[in-house]
Each structure stands twice: as structure tokens, then as C-alpha cells.
From Swiss-Prot:
Belongs to the HesB/IscA family. It comes from the Bacteria. It holds the Pfam family Fe-S_biosyn. Binds 1 iron-sulfur cluster per subunit. It comes from Buchnera aphidicola subsp. Cinara cedri (strain Cc). This is Iron-sulfur cluster insertion protein ErpA. GO terms for biological process: iron-sulfur cluster assembly. Its cofactor is iron-sulfur cluster. Keywords: Iron, Iron-sulfur, Metal-binding.
Length: 111
């Protein structure tokens, strides 16, 4: 099962639930995707969406749904999705064992 191959922390789940509450729509799903860009070649993206596309992989945990396209999922397997708040701000963070290198800001990576 994919939910065991991609870990979602309690902090990430709590933040997603807060975002859904703010939008007043618990049917929304968090899409996580990888695009080209950033200083290391690839970067993560996050969006709330209503619709799951035909080939999306769906991970349901603690009442929230995360959707990932089939190309991005191969680069995220074994990873951990977290949400952190510190003096620099707050953000979703992905610990990705597939990344060969990450940039200093942690927003982009290379494979």
C-alpha cells in the first residue's frame, strides 16, 4: 500500500485539515506534484483540488486525501510529508530519500 511508502506526519495532517476547514470544503484533496524549476532542477508543488484525475494515485489517511500523479509518485516513494512552523515561516516539507541533492532553501532538489 502506498500509504506505507509515503509517510504523512500528524503535523501535515493537522495543517491539511485546517486548510480544508478554512475553505469550508472537506471534499478537497491536496495534490502534491513535482515540476522542473528551482536551483537544483526540480521543485515540489502543492494545490487543493476538487477532482482526482484518471491516473492519480490517492492516499487517504486520517480523513484527508492526498493525490499524486503517476510521474511524481515515483520520485516521492519512501518519502515523508511534514508541515513545520519556525522563525523562517511555515511550510510543507518533503523528506525525499530519492533526492541526490537539495538546495539550501529546501524547496528544490535533483535526482
Amino acid at each position: 500500500m502506498l500509504k506505507h511508502q509515503i509517510k504523512i506526519t500528524i503535523n501535515a495532517i493537522k495543517k491539511i485539515k485546517k486548510l480544508l476547514l478554512k475553505k469550508k470544503n472537506f471534499k478537497l484533496k491536496l495534490r502534491i506534484f513535482i515540476t522542473g524549476g528551482g536551483c537544483s532542477g526540480f521543485q515540489y508543488g502543492f494545490e487543493l483540488e476538487k477532482i482526482t484525475k484518471k491516473n492519480d494515485i490517492s492516499i487517504i489517511q486520517s480523513g484527508i486525501e492526498i493525490i499524486i500523479d503517476p510521474i511524481s509518485i515515483q520520485y516521492l516513494l519512501g518519502g515523508k510529508i511534514d508541515y513545520i512552523e519556525n522563525l523562517e515561516g511555515s511550510k510543507f516539507v518533503i523528506s525525499n530519500p530519492n533526492a541526490k541533492r537539495t538546495c539550501g532553501c529546501g524547496l528544490s532538489f535533483s535526482i
